[in-house]
Amino acid sequence: MSVIKSFPDRYASKVATILMLDEEINKMLYYNDKNDVDIYTLPRVKNPVGTLKDKKVFLNRRVAETFKESDVSMFVNIKNDAPHSKYGKTFRYIETLTLEIGVICHNACRNTLNGARESVIFDRVQRILKTNEDLQCIGEPILSPTTQSYNIPYEYSAYIVTMKVDYFGEM
């Protein structure tokens, strides 16, 4: 078994794990075939990380192909890892990691009694990213405005948020 050594990989893995362990998110991802019941009243997802990782939640890659059936998934990607710069000055010992967190949902499983599935998931993702103290580094994470992805087939909806964190190069 390999040990993740670099901070960017450890941090992306931590973000994905925290999101998969959230009960609201994992139920919305796991019970993708349930549209006409209150998804939050359904049984807990057993072993959410083992159940969702590389099936519904993808780390450092986008969804490999469009789904053959109605489905929903999420991805956490390292977008950039570079020396921190501010006001035109680059800092030698501080790095800035940029992550993309996205949700893609087929229209057939989109509407639920709890709201639009991808919107419910994305709202929860943003609340976690803004408030989870385990995700702080040098200061708090900075979130960009959420954007809709238009380069997907018409029958899907997708949203992406970019998150930046500063860290010491040897963290």
Write out the residue ranges for each language-model feature.
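Small/polar-rich, solvent-exposed N-terminal microdomains that initiate assembly or binding
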Residues: 1-87
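A short, hydrophobic secondary-structure junction motif
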Residues: 61-64, 102-107, 126-131
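Acidic-leaning, charged glycine-interspersed low-complexity segments
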Residues: 71-74, 116-171
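Beta-strand elements of well-folded, non-transmembrane domains
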Residues: 80-84, 101-109, 164-171
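Short, solvent-exposed beta-strand/turn "edge" segments of beta-rich domains on protein surfaces
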Residues: 86-94, 151-156
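Extracellular/virion structural assembly segments
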Residues: 92-94, 106-127
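A small/polar active-site loop signature that marks catalytic segments
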Residues: 97
